[in-house]
Design a protein with these regions (language model features):
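Extracytoplasmic/secreted proteins, especially bacterial periplasmic and envelope-associated proteins
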Residues: 7-10, 14, 31, 35-38, ...
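Solvent-exposed loop/turn segments at secondary-structure junctions
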Residues: 54-55, 113-115, 150-154, 211, ...
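Acidic/histidine-rich catalytic neighborhood of metal-dependent amide-processing enzymes
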Residues: 165, 199-202, 223-313, 327, ...
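Soluble metallo-hydrolase cores and metallopeptidase-like ectodomains found primarily
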Residues: 65-100, 156-230, 242-249, 253-255
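Structural recognition of the beta-strand scaffold that forms the well-ordered cores
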Residues: 106-109, 144-147, 204, 215-218, ...
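Second-shell loop/turn segments in exported
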Residues: 1-2, 18-27, 90, 119-128, ...
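Active-site-adjacent substrate-binding region
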Residues: 144, 149, 295-396
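Noncatalytic luminal/extracellular "stalk/propeptide" segments of secretory-pathway proteins
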Residues: 2-6, 10-118
């Protein structure tokens, strides 16, 4: 029988290695969902598939030229196609955007406007500032939008939104610097992309219990378009599959649900589909895994909407794992959808890996089997603590 560490890293190598990028609507996303389904059925879980419509998008070629020199540029996910030669209008603040004549030109955003990626219009955490930036751009109708990437390493796109109507792409820092310094009279941009209706699916496996109450262990399996997504989040999926195999032969008093969500990296499509049928009043707690297991990272644990009793229980288990730390609550993953509905939520994540997230560097060889084992073992101890509890025990 394989050791737990070998099982965990095997799942990561399959998802982030053989399959690779798994953004919604892609063949990789479909292949990953099928792999997870097969693994859950092999373990003996009762499996439910929850499909959601989503955009299926692909990019063939991206060209940016200035003064007959070809420059690096990265098309933004879900961008419509464009081919245009036009002058460039730089803007670094909302005030500059408000006063700029952008019609038919190429807007080059930098500085305060690109200090962070702009959230999709439908994202529940979108800010008024982001909404203002989107509204100004769509009203002023530039031919395309270029965003200067703020950091040297972090692989963030300026926009990632199928509802954003303008062609857009993101510039590496050195290219943005060159364009702003030289201010060429015209630049040529060509984005060859295709967008059509597609679908993605949650894969839900269950171990039925004697009671209707449920513990949910969840992890998203989709990725951003730019990464094989080992730490974000093949490792999380590996953990829930390994825990499913461990507990499948020993049913608990409550039902245990293993939810592999898809749609997290664009919009919470997966968790929204889940909540169309899920009943918050029946869920004892949710345990989410997103970002644990990197060699250069530290495994983290936190809680949202949880009682003091649940938090004390989780922290007492954590105390036996000196390589992991308790952190302040963070909302940027699927556990927040449970917490917002009053369901106690525990979240496993990773600290110290920001620059790896969503980048081509998030590969399977960066994952530590020992750190995955650490997170899985701690989660198993917490699950054993929770499985006989009543729903009320963990509520705030």
């Amino acid at each position: 029988m394989l050791e737990l560490s070998e099982v965990l890293i095997g799942h990561v190598r399959e998802l982030a290695g053989r399959i690779g990028t798994r953004y919604i609507g892609s063949t990789g996303n479909t292949a990953a969902g099928e792999y997870i389904r097969r693994e859950m059925e092999r373990i003996g879980l009762a499996v439910e598939i929850q499909e959601s419509p989503c955009p299926a998008w692909s990019a063939r070629r991206t060209i940016l030229e200035a003064e007959e020199i070809q420059l690096r540029v990265y098309v933004d996910p879900f961008s419509p196609p464009v081919e245009v030669t036009a002058s460039m209008v730089p803007a670094c603040t909302i005030a500059e955007l408000e006063h700029a004549d952008l019609s038919g030109k190429i807007a080059l955003l930098y500085g305060d406007l690109t200090s962070a990626p702009v959230s999709p219009k439908q994202w529940f955490l979108i800010t008024e500032r982001e909404q203002q930036i989107i509204a100004l751009l769509e009203r002023k109708r530039p031919a395309a939008v270029l965003s200067a990437r703020p950091g040297v390493s972090y692989f963030g796109h300026g926009f990632c939104d199928a509802d954003f109507s303008l062609p857009s792409a993101t510039l590496p820092r050195d290219v943005a610097l060159a364009l702003l310094r030289k201010n060429p009279s015209a630049v040529h941009l060509r984005l060859e992309t295709e967008r059509r209706p597609g679908s993605t699916a949650n894969v839900i496996g269950r171990i039925p219990g004697k009671r209707a109450e449920t513990i949910v262990l969840c992890a998203h399996y989709d990725t951003a378009t730019t990464t094989p997504g080992a730490c974000d989040n093949a490792g999380g999926v590996a953990i829930i599959l390994a825990l499913a195999a461990r507990f499948a032969s020993r049913p608990a008093a409550c039902t245990i649900e293993f939810a592999a969500f898809s749609g997290h990296e664009y919009l919470p499509l997966g968790v929204d589909a889940y909540w169309k049928t899920a009943k918050a009043e029946k869920i004892i707690a949710a345990v989410n895994f997103d970002g644990a297991g990197h060699i250069l990272g530290t495994n983290t644990l936190t809680a949202m909407a949880a009682s003091d009793k649940l938090i004390r229980a989780a922290r007492s288990k954590l105390a036996a794992y000196p390589g992991a730390v308790w952190v302040e609550p963070w909302p940027e993953s699927d556990h927040s959808a449970f917490a917002m509905r009053g369901v106690p939520a525990l979240a496993f994540g990773g600290a110290g890996i920001r620059e790896i997230t969503h980048s081509p560097a998030d590969t399977a060889d960066g994952i530590s089997p020992l750190k995955l084992n650490e997170a899985a073992s701690l989660a198993a101890e917490i699950l054993l603590e929770l499985k006989d509890k009543k729903v009320e025990w963990g509520r705030e």
